[in-house]
Every structure is written in structure tokens, then in C-alpha cells.
């Protein structure tokens, strides 16, 4: 029949993230074990990145003249999230600031992430609320790990303005065709994209997977990444670069009591 069956798995206690997305029993999300059951940063699934993406210069954010240590990709992926609601419109999880998060990031906030399964599409929204008494700077993004048979089998269809391996300095214009290849002797490979015209898509001729990442205008950056001989490729929508929160005019700022919602989606197909 033409009716496909899909399942979306969310693990609130592991960073409030997607940990599985299957189509007719075929898994599209890659899981790293034993990392799944450890308490360190999840390097699998679909981590939520907040209040920053990547690693800021010196591993710190500077707020009001004081340096605050920051984990790679922020801390939302290290926290257990609370289940706010479960219903026909999907699952909503919440993460609120605590004394521990304020040690890293001196702001009061609530994050709400909603996951909704629409056939073979997972629709995801993130609402950031400033609950404090001062303007709140941040960036956000997601770090999805998708199953891949082998890097050389993965063919990307992406339109963007620039493409490089380092976000610092002048960014070279993107080639006509975006590719992700490994340099001799390197253990990983990365592409940092700006001016992305979503959706980003890849097709894997080895496992027959086609994955589409679409995103609203709050995202204009993309990251492609692959490491070791692992069977995954990351195709990630980002709102900021590693040091954006430290750089004037390069991050989001919410005024007191303001909120912002961003939306994106993952669509999985068999080809």
C-alpha cells in the first residue's frame, strides 16, 4: 500500500531530543552507544543547541564584563526536560533556568520544544522566553545525526551563499555542488554554510534514504559534518556560529518578557 508507517521517539531526560525516527521500521536517526546511557553530552540523535552552537572563543561567553564558562553547543542537550503536554498536536517539553544554568548563563528563561509527527515529517518548534529582568542574548540550532551507509554514498542537494571549513574571516562563495569529502588522514570533515536556502536534502544510494531538513527564516546557516568511519552524517540547521553570542549584532536578543519561536522539520523517504 502507499500508506507508510512512521514512528518518532523523544527522550525527555536526554536533552529533550529526538532519539529515533523510523519509516516502515527502518531507522533514520543514528545512535551512539554507550553514549546514550551516559550523562555526558549526547553525540547522537537530534540535540537541541542553546544558548549557543559550537564552542565560543576560549570556551567562555562574556556578559557584563564577566566571563562565563560554556559547554560545546550550550547546555540544553545536557539537561533533562519536563513533559509539558502530550496531545494531538504532538509532545511539548519544557526546560527552565536553574541556579546551575545561571552559573553558565546568567539569565532566566523558559524553553518549549514541540515535536509533531505528520506522516513521514517530524515538525519541530522551539520557543524561547525571556523570564528575567534584562535583555537576553542567545543563538540556537540543532545537530541531527542521520544514518548513512558510507560518506561516498551520500549526495547533497543544497543551495547556499558561502561554504567553508572555518567560520572565521572571509567566507568563500559556495560551489555549484556542495560535497562532503574527507581529507587524507583526517578523522572528520565539516562544511559551514551561510545564506542557506532551505530545504537541505541528501540521498544515500547505499541505504535508499532520502532526508530533507527544512527550516524557517530564523535559520540561515547549515553545518555538514561526519566523523571517523561511523555510519552517520550530520545535516544541521543553525541560527548562529560558535562565537556569535559574544559578537555584537550576530545573535538574537529578547527583551524582558519577550518570546521567539522558530520552526523546522525533518522529512524521511525511501528512494
Where are each of the predicted segments found?
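Asparagine-centered strand-capping/turn motif at beta-strand->loop junctions
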Residues: 10, 126-132, 226-227, 268
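Short, small-residue-biased leader/transition segments that mark boundaries at the very start
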Residues: 2-5
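Extended, loop-rich substrate-binding clefts of extracytoplasmic carbohydrate-active enzymes
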Residues: 66-119
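Active-site/ligand-binding surface loops and adjacent short beta/alpha elements
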Residues: 135-137, 144-217
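Short Pro-Gly-centered flexible turn/kink motifs
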Residues: 61-69, 253-270
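Acidic-aromatic substrate-binding/catalytic surfaces of carbohydrate-active enzymes
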Residues: 9-66, 234
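Beta-strand-rich interaction surfaces with strong enrichment in secreted/lumenal proteins
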Residues: 112-114, 189-190, 249-254
Amino acid at each position: 500500500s502507499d500508506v507508510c508507517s512512521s514512528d518518532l521517539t523523544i527522550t525527555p531526560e536526554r536533552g529533550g531530543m529526538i532519539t529515533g525516527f523510523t519509516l516502515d521500521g527502518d531507522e533514520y536517526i543514528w545512535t551512539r552507544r554507550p553514549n546514550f546511557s551516559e550523562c555526558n553530552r549526547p553525540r547522537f540523535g537530534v540535540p537541541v543547541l542553546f544558548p549557543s552552537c559550537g564552542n565560543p572563543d576560549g570556551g567562555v561567553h562574556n556578559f557584563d564584563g564577566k566571563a562565563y564558562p560554556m559547554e560545546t553547543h550550550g547546555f540544553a542537550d545536557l539537561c533533562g526536560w519536563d513533559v509539558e503536554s502530550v496531545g494531538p498536536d504532538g509532545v511539548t517539553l519544557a526546560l527552565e533556568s536553574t541556579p546551575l544554568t545561571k552559573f553558565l548563563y546568567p539569565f532566566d528563561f523558559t524553553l518549549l520544544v514541540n515535536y509533531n509527527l505528520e506522516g513521514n515529517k517530524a515538525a519541530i518548534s522551539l520557543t524561547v522566553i525571556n523570564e528575567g529582568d534584562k535583555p537576553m542574548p542567545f543563538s540556537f540550532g540543532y545537530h541531527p545525526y542521520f544514518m548513512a551507509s558510507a560518506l561516498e554514498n551520500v549526495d547533497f542537494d543544497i543551495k547556499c551563499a558561502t561554504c567553508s571549513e572555518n567560520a572565521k574571516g572571509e567566507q568563500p562563495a559556495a560551489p555549484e555542488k556542495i560535497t562532503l569529502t574527507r581529507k587524507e588522514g583526517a578523522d572528520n570533515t565539516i562544511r559551514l554554510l551561510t545564506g542557506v536556502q532551505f530545504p537541505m536534502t541528501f540521498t544515500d544510494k547505499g541505504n535508499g534514504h532520502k532526508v530533507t531538513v527544512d527550516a524557517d527564516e530564523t535559520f540561515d546557516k547549515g553545518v555538514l559534518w561526519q566523523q571517523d568511519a561511523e555510519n552517520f552524517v550530520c545535516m544541521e540547521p543553525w541560527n548562529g556560529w560558535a562565537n556569535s553570542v559574544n559578537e555584537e549584532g550576530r545573535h538574537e536578543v529578547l527583551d524582558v518578557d519577550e518570546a521567539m519561536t522558530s520552526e523546522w522539520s525533518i522529512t524521511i523517504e525511501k528512494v
